Amino acid sequence: MMGSVQTAPADDRFRGWLRIEPVAGLSEERWDPLLICVAGYILTAVGRLHQLFGALEAIHLAAIAGALTVVIYLANTREVRRPGAVRCLTTNLVGLLVFWMVLSLTTALNAGVSVDLVFNNFIKTALISFVVAASIRSVDDVERLAFVYLAGAVIYSAIVMTRFDVGSGNDWRLGHLYYYDANDYATFTVTAMPLGLYFLNRAQRRAVRLFAAVGLVVLTLGFVWSGSRGGFIAFAAVAAYVVFRFKAIPLRRRLLSTALVVVVLLATASDHYWEQMSTITSDTDYNHTEESGRLQIWSRGVGYMLANPLLGVGPGNFAVAEGTLSPMAARQQFGIGVRWNAPHNSFIQIGAELGFPGLALYIAILVSSFVALRRAGDLRPSLTASLIGFVVGSFFLSLAYSEMLYTLVALAVGVQKVTATRQVQPRPCCESLN
């Protein structure tokens, strides 16, 4: 209590920073070692915290966080965290996607590329995504991890903007950053913005609201610096959803919060930025006219799907297909260089690499994640908006296997787990941040 002369135990003081009022009828849950490790995983796998600070990368923080998360989960004895608690349509679909990726190894153009992606990357991502969902004990934990996701995006943005500069001319926007390129980063910021709006309007602790407000400014500035046109489209989609569907926050406050972001965008966007955005619908843009533009790449990607409808060209092999199967590939025998392009579309990426069954599984994972959020209470609009931001942004990017997506999917599954058997009752929002 604020006026008490007694000192709370250290554990209670730590819990007070991110303590969430439990759903009515549940016992109060604290931060525990598993949830702390899950937070560390999100900060490293999505927020790339270890790459921002050399000392953390030197000690292999990402590997440590992931390993500890799995080890502590395996030692779990609580019923709410048992594997059966998160066996649902979405997790089953992710499991089927992993199986289909392994099956697609048999027809991969370059087996080494596929084996590396499947066994050194995606299986780990899918496994820890399952553990993230399983670690969630209540809606409280979802709020905690959503705040960690937001904090990771804000920290990443702040560091990037202090270490990378934008100049003039062709150098007016950010380029390749830590792990993400500028377009990936723009989508990351867009997925975090709805969470910032949620904590800005729902948190009772002033420090948390201040962090959310400053975080939104930082995210918006970083978003502008990215100069991403696909990110701009994703931002517009999220903004429309926030204004018209974000019912957990009163309309007046939604409009004011959105206005804050828009004002920062208008105040910081340069003429180069708006010139770049104006080319989105231009028929003369390289994406429309050049063979390395997105439309031509997507067209060839559909061709790879039709030529390999069942198992695709193999996980991670889209670029290999560009260099060996595309109409331009024959030029290489004459000493003419050919660009081995990325798909620049997550749906084309999955469809070309895993065939139509893989594409169907991917779409089903996305749809089931949205469905999983239908009873998420106050968190539904923010997490739904984050997923919308990812889906729209990833339409122009190669993010089908990304930790960003499967962390959001894990939060959706976690919400479904803790609300599946009971109606979410009104409760003090964000008391975990009080």
Region annotations inferred by a language model:
Residues G355-V367:
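Hydrophobic alpha-helical transmembrane segments
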Residues I36-V46, V98, L216, N341, ...:
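Loop-to-helix entry and N-terminal half of a specific, functionally important transmembrane alpha helix
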Residues L56-A63, L117-N120, Y178-V190, G230, ...:
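Membrane-interface micro-motifs in multi-pass membrane enzymes
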Residues A45-A55, Q349-L354, L379-V418:
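Membrane helix-loop boundary segments at the extracytoplasmic
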Residues M1-L103, L109-V113, L117, R137-F147, ...:
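Transmembrane signal-anchor hairpin modules in multi-pass inner-membrane enzymes, especially those
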Residues H176-Y178, T284-S299, L306-A307, L311-L354, ...:
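Long extracytoplasmic/lumenal interhelical loops at the membrane interface
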Residues M2-S4, G25-E28, A67-V70, G95-T106, ...:
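Alpha-helical transmembrane segments of multi-pass inner-membrane proteins
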Residues L52-A55, T107-D116, L177, V224-W225, ...:
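Membrane-interface helix caps and helix-loop-helix hairpins in membrane proteins
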